[in-house]
Amino acid sequence: MTLPFADSAQSTLGIEWELALVDAVSGELRSEAPDLLRALHVAEGLADDDVNPHMTSELLQNTVELVTGVHERVDAATADLGRIAARVADAAAARGISLFCQGTHPFADAIAQPSTPSERYDRMLDLTQYWGRQLLIFGVHVHVGLDDVSKAMPVVNGLVNRVPHLLALSASSPFWAGTDTGYQSQRTLLFQQLPTAGLPFQFQEWEDFERCVAQMEQVGMIADVTECRWDVRAVPRLGTVEMRACDGLATLEEIAAVTAYTQCLVDDLSASLERGETVEVLPPWHAQENKWRAARYGMDATVIVDARGTQVPLAEHLPAEIERLTPVAERLGCEAELAGVQAMIDDGGAARQRRVEAQALAGPPAEGEDADDAVAPLRAVVLDAAARTRASLDGRTG
């Protein structure tokens, strides 16, 4: 099998943002994506058989996925994403719906959510059964272009080393089915239950990857390469590597920060390969442990940074990483966005959600709420995230 790797300019990028539709008052999920997308399709002046590449359906009818075009700079990509999201948000608001993005919805019943009719989704749900029906999860995916297919596998390996960093930064799913899981990213634990999800296998050469995909197809593990749903993967048809480990993020500012970090990592790895250097590959047992620690502890995790087993607190290693990559960011024009990583370290993700829940528990019930309503504190978490998304789209502080 050969998997042609599309031509792509080095370090160009695109972003995918998975957003849930929630009731603007109750915070409960609304399975109205098919109707909303249909209305937007008409509003965009598209014919019935046209494809809108920027607004698409997802596994569940409560979810829309927004996709940017290809850009050279992070600011242009996030501006593009903001324009797309604003159109969706306005159309949703007319229906009493808000946009919500965190790694999971904190109190919804996952199995009760209707799926989008699709041969691909139906096949996946039939295969995965209970665990497939648990995938009430939302993420942010970042694609970065590579100008040479020979870089793809080493760059994927290098990005695996930084999965815990990006996961901890974005971790935003401590709650599941009304319960605090004790984890920072419940989404991570859910998604890796799929047989073709999780960390990728480690290859040095593109031919090894092609051989793996061919064998997976041969034995019926996958129908095609797109069903390799790894946390980091090469995407042959786009000529990119894709970082998929991040939990959902509520604001454009947060998305810009993780996008800048990802773009800088890929560009730095590409440059090192051009200098003839070798990308260090963490032993898979270290990579697996790092991912689990980030999902469990978030920014409080200690990560393994080399094959010798050196361990460093993530809260120390990540700022050092940002400092190391700042010259790369200056060249790429994303220095300001990369600097936004520090704000996420200070106040992002699961820590914020738990703080919102605690404040709701300590305060009086909101107007119209029952003091004994166990869902109320988690409703506050949903509405806080939705408000931050709306503020970010409106150009206010998210």
From Swiss-Prot:
Keyword annotations of the record: ATP-binding, Ligase, Nucleotide-binding
Pfam families noted in UniProt: GCS2
GO biological process: modified amino acid biosynthetic process
Protein's name in the database: Putative glutamate--cysteine ligase 2
Native organism: Micrococcus luteus (strain ATCC 4698 / DSM 20030 / JCM 1464 / CCM 169 / CCUG 5858 / IAM 1056 / NBRC 3333 / NCIMB 9278 / NCTC 2665 / VKM Ac-2230) (Micrococcus lysodeikticus)
ATP-binding listed as a keyword: yes
Biological classification of the source: Bacteria, Bacillati, Actinomycetota, Actinomycetes, Micrococcales
InterPro entries per UniProt: GCL_type2/YbdK_subfam, GCS2, Gln_synth/guanido_kin_cat_dom, YbdK
Entry's EC annotation: 6.3.2.2
GO MF, one annotated term: glutamate-cysteine ligase activity
